[in-house]
Amino acid sequence: MTRKAIYPGTFDPFTNGHLDVLERALNIFDHVEVVLAENSQKQTLFSVDERLEMVHEVVREFSNVSVDVLHAGLLADYARQAGASAIVRGVRQVKDFEYEFQMSLLNRHLYPEVTTVFLMPNVKYTYVASTIIREVSMLGGDVSKFVHPFVLDKLNAKRAEREGQS
């Protein structure tokens, strides 16, 4: 029996911290599906298609990773339909855990067969958040140590595009 997990997130952009959590999940599960949440409530820098392209590029070396988009609906329903036994969540700090713990309880209520697995990234990524990466990059800071080169190119292009508009 294949042990499958889903790893949901906005991934705006996908960072080395996300990649680290994914690699840790692959040590536990046979297959991990990265699920991009469209999340209309969040203001994103990149479109869903741009984020999908970046994640595909970063994970293409892994034969046991797939990528999909959750356009609408409940994550618990998506997990059930995908045949996943677990939802992987990266937790960098206590405040992440508090929110994720509440969500895991709700998901367990909706889909008792699924387990939420909390994974901590390598300590060098504990302060790396997509929000910080976006802000630093858009201000011209060097984020090359925190994202894949393909993602860095996309961030630089987005910054150049914004600078051209002002």
UniProtKB/Swiss-Prot annotation:
Cofactor: Mg(2+)
UniProt-listed Pfam families: CTP_transf_like (PF01467)
Source organism of the structure: Chlorobaculum parvum (strain DSM 263 / NCIMB 8327) (Chlorobium vibrioforme subsp. thiosulfatophilum)
Lineage per the UniProt record: Bacteria, Pseudomonadati, Chlorobiota, Chlorobiia, Chlorobiales
Listed InterPro entries: Cyt_trans-like, PPAT, Rossmann-like_a/b/a_fold
The protein, known as: Phosphopantetheine adenylyltransferase
GO MF annotation: an example: ATP binding
Record-level GO BP terms: coenzyme A biosynthetic process
Binding, substrate: T10, K42, L75, R89
UniProt binding sites for ATP: T10, F11, H18, G90, V91, R92, E100, Y125, T126, Y127, V128, A129, S130, T131
Function: Reversibly transfers an adenylyl group from ATP to 4'-phosphopantetheine, yielding dephospho-CoA (dPCoA) and pyrophosphate.
Record keywords, A-Z: ATP-binding, Coenzyme A biosynthesis, Cytoplasm, Magnesium, Nucleotide-binding, Nucleotidyltransferase, Transferase
Gene Ontology CC terms: cytoplasm
Record-annotated site: Transition state stabilizer: H18
Record-stated family: Belongs to the bacterial CoaD family.
Subunit text: Homohexamer.
EC number(s) on file: 2.7.7.3
Primary subcellular site in the record, as a coarse category: cytoplasm
